[in-house]
């Protein structure tokens, strides 16, 4: 066995802020203990980025901003969100946004008998404010050395666009931002060995770059 997905989830201890001293110490203890046992971490709902990954590179990636999951129970992330993150959150290090949803209208999910309503904002109108092309481009734009195909398996089976995920190499050794403006658009190219990957995205305004 080369890898195991495990972890824990739970509420905050009473009286403690998510980014307060209690949780910062807990977070650091988790990172140090994982390093001791040669365990890589992909953390969701982390504390603010502090540069700890420079000391403990086993802290491979983290969420730390509104990720893809936000689209499941709200009006969703607006189109400009994806082209703001490279200029804000991603300056602090890799982000596990979990891009790559193919069923952007949730047509299969809405008809599922197992669907669970999270809150009043989670309605039949929920969708991802994106295109399929942008979902694929975000694998390049929103850098993370560990990427996952976050949609249901049924939405990938037989889909020709899934070939990009098969070909993609997240272990990039060179990156360059070719063009962009915060919240407007971004164009990023990355190299992994002899492979080059280019991702470009815009907000809700059409444009040529």
Task: Please annotate each region the language model reported.
Residues 124-135:
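Structural motif
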Residues 182-209:
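Carbohydrate-binding surface patches
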Residues 1-122:
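Aromatic- and carboxylate-enriched substrate-binding clefts and catalytic-loop regions
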Residues 133-181:
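Catalytic cores of secreted or luminal carbohydrate-active enzymes
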Residues 41, 141, 198:
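Conserved, mostly hydrophobic/aromatic
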């Amino acid at each position: 066995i080369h890898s195991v997905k495990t972890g824990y989830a739970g509420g905050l201890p009473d009286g403690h802020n998510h980014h307060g001293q209690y949780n910062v110490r807990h977070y650091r203890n988790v990172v140090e203990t994982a390093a001791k046992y040669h365990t890589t971490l992909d953390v969701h709902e982390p504390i603010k980025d502090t540069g700890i990954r420079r000391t403990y590179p086993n802290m491979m990636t983290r969420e730390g901003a509104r990720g893809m999951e936000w689209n499941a129970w709200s009006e969703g992330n607006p189109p400009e969100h994806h082209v703001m993150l490279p200029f804000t959150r991603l300056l602090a290090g890799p982000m596990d946004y979990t891009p790559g949803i193919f069923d952007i209208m949730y047509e299969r999910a809405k008809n599922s008998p197992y669907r669970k309503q999270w809150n009043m904002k989670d309605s039949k109108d929920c969708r991802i404010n994106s295109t399929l092309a942008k979902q694929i481009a975000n694998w390049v734009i929103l850098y993370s050395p560990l990427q996952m195909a976050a949609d249901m398996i049924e939405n990938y089976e037989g889909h020709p666009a899934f070939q990009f995920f098969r070909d993609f190499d997240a272990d990039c050794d060179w990156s360059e931002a070719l063009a962009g403006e915060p919240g407007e658009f971004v164009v990023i190219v990355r190299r992994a060995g002899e492979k080059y990957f280019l991702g470009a995205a815009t907000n809700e305004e059409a444009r040529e770059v």
